[in-house]
Amino acid sequence: MFYISKDNPCYYFTSVTNNRLPVFRTDKLKEITCNAISEARKSSEILIFAYVIMPDHFHIITDGKLKPSNILRYLNGVTARRVIDYLKENNFTSSLDKLKQFEKKRGYKYSLWEHHSDTFTITSESMFMQKVNYIHLNPIRAELVGNMDDYLYSSARIWKRKLLENEPLEMDIGKIKWRET
């Protein structure tokens, strides 16, 4: 079980695409991102409590077993590899051109993510729920849906116990041991 406390924090991450490009406009790329997050989750053994994938960024809350920099490295590294591989395999050259970054030693490489991702340490259940609600309201604020349950690439349904048969990403909310009532 996971207790949220100062000694055992969670982390709230926001990763933004390079130049805020709307890379995740299509369901296919959101699905690839969910699969990549799931892969990172398993390989790094992190717990994921909430998420949303927006057109140009994602928010996610994880446990604090690893250092935040390592969690972010796993999440952003695996998602970048999977998304860029998909774009290459399907000849999305104009999208790849927008993600090119020049490196002196190696020439061009691709950079999916901005290099200043936002990390926030969560040390209380009330702060945790504030971030969960913020994440779930994101698609409404962006006018992508009218009801948070209608946005497929979010954990909102899971938190409301309205799971779909094939949720895009598994959550670990059952592993939270709540202290406050």
Region spans (language model):
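Short catalytic/metal-binding and nucleic-acid-binding patches
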Residues: 1-181
